[in-house]
Amino acid sequence: MSGPYDEASEEITDSFWEVGNYKRTVKRIDDGHRLCNDLMSCVQERAKIEKAYAQQLTDWAKRWRQLIEKGPQYGSLERAWGAMMTEADKVSELHQEVKNSLLNEDLEKVKNWQKDAYHKQIMGGFKETKEAEDGFRKAQKPWAKKMKELEAAKKAYHLACKEEKLAMTREMNSKTEQSVTPEQQKKLVDKVDKCRQDVQKTQEKYEKVLEDVGKTTPQYMEGMEQVFEQCQQFEEKRLVFLKEVLLDIKRHLNLAENSSYIHVYRELEQAIRGADAQEDLRWFRSTSGPGMPMNWPQFEEWNPDLPHTAAKKEKQPKKAEGAALSNATGAVESTSQAGDRGSVSSYDRGQAYATEWSDDESGNPFGGNEANGGANPFEDDAKGVRVRALYDYDGQEQDELSFKAGDELTKLGEEDEQGWCRGRLDSGQLGLYPANYVEAI
């Protein structure tokens, strides 16, 4: 008698050689196309990040360059600080180049390769996927047919074994039962014999089909291997290509290996190391400290042709280039190293006027003693000029006027070298305002 039939013995494996399990290899072709799309999306997102970072650097550099130029920092340290803004602009350009390389080179390279490697069909899907599917199906078809016969033969054999075991159990139990007649006993014995014959027949058929499957297996394996290797070659091209693309992306992203990037920071370091504290201190001493020239008081003859000899001359701007001060015995020229700021902050302008308007009535333009060279111009409307505001202006300091576009006020003096004028609002408030914010009426 054969061994007992056990349905659990029918194990389903996940092997490539099982019928239909080649579909994972076929699916890999479709996955390859999708992965190309994923890589392009990945590159696009990184390019957006590079673009945004480059713009942020540019905006940061512009804002802080203006703040530094208008601020109180001076000399070589100012130039060193400003070099950071130059670094930001140059690095911004490099990140723009990274963005352009990612989009114009790397992404386009993947897109073109994908287009050449995968060919869409009118009915959907890719030509390469269909060729692989057809190749595997053709190689597996004869073997799959044999496997179907084998499964049927095995099932018949196992069923016959099950019937044989059941018949033998009944026949053995009947021997102990008094109610079973000899005729019934004989039928049970015949049933056992018949089941044994069925087991033998199904076993022979099962073994024969199994032998046939064994004979076709080598040919089946050869055909499947051939199609699989074709898929492997296609996948190898994709893997090698994407590796090359990733290396290109790395090369574009790695600014540390970019000679221009290295040069930017070499220049920045040189600019910072060029800052000289002693030089800056000497400059400040000569332009804003004890080293400045001075018109020391001395006896002056009265000259009827010069009615305002007692009035002090206006000081030059703090950082104006080529500022010259002269005295009675000679002229001494002091040149600023900071350069023309273009737009002077209220800090600088306030410093200049704080020294101009002293409490000495002989030099105070607000003084009321006419013997000192003239009357206070703020007290005489006839000496003022009516002007109209072109733009809104909000005073940033206590000595500045505030007005709206269209407001009228009185101009009480000429524009100074820093672009400010003295004026009076109709409310009587006196102060300073930007000269180019108004027009004569």
UniProtKB/Swiss-Prot annotation:
Modified positions (Phosphothreonine) in chain numbering: 181
Q: Which residues form the SH3 domain?
A: 382-441
Q: In which tissues is it expressed?
A: Highly expressed in brain (at protein level).
Q: Which GO terms describe its molecular function?
A: cytoskeletal protein binding; identical protein binding; phospholipid binding
Please list the GO biological process terms of this entry: actin filament organization; cytoskeleton organization; negative regulation of endocytosis; neuron projection morphogenesis; plasma membrane tubulation; positive regulation of dendrite development; protein localization to membrane; protein localization to plasma membrane
Q: Enumerate the Pfam families for this protein.
A: FCH (PF00611), SH3_9 (PF14604)
- Cystine pairs: none
Q: Which GO terms describe its cellular component?
A: axon terminus; COPI-coated vesicle; cytoplasm; cytoplasmic vesicle membrane; cytosol; endosome; glutamatergic synapse; perinuclear region of cytoplasm
Q: Which SMART domains match?
A: FCH, SH3
Report the residue ranges that make up the F-BAR domain in this protein.
10-280
User: For the region Disordered, what residue ranges are annotated?
Assistant: 310-380
Major place of localization?
A: cytoplasm
Basic and acidic residues biased stretches: 311-321
Q: Does the keyword Protease apply?
A: no
Specify residue ranges for compositional bias: Polar residues: 326-348
Q: Domains: what does the record tell us?
A: The F-BAR domain forms a coiled coil and mediates membrane-binding and membrane tubulation. In the autoinhibited conformation, interaction with the SH3 domain inhibits membrane tubulation mediated by the F-BAR domain. DNM1 binding abolishes autoinhibition.
> What does the annotation say about its assembly with partners?
Homodimer. May form heterooligomers with other PACSINs. Interacts with MAPT. Interacts with TRPV4. Interacts (via SH3 domain) with SYNJ1 and WASL. Interacts (via SH3 domain) with DNM1; the interaction is reduced by DNM1 phosphorylation. Interacts with DNM2 and DNM3. Interacts with both COBL and DBNL. Identified in a complex composed of COBL, PACSIN1 and WASL. Interacts with EHD1 and EHD3.
Q: Could you tell me what this protein does?
A: Binds to membranes via its F-BAR domain and mediates membrane tubulation. Plays a role in the reorganization of the microtubule cytoskeleton via its interaction with MAPT; this decreases microtubule stability and inhibits MAPT-induced microtubule polymerization. Plays a role in cellular transport processes by recruiting DNM1, DNM2 and DNM3 to membranes. Plays a role in the reorganization of the actin cytoskeleton and in neuron morphogenesis via its interaction with COBL and WASL, and by recruiting COBL to the cell cortex.
Recorded protein name is Protein kinase C and casein kinase substrate in neurons protein 1
Naturally occurring in which organism (per UniProt): Rattus norvegicus (Rat)
Instruction: Name the gene that codes for it.
Output: Pacsin1
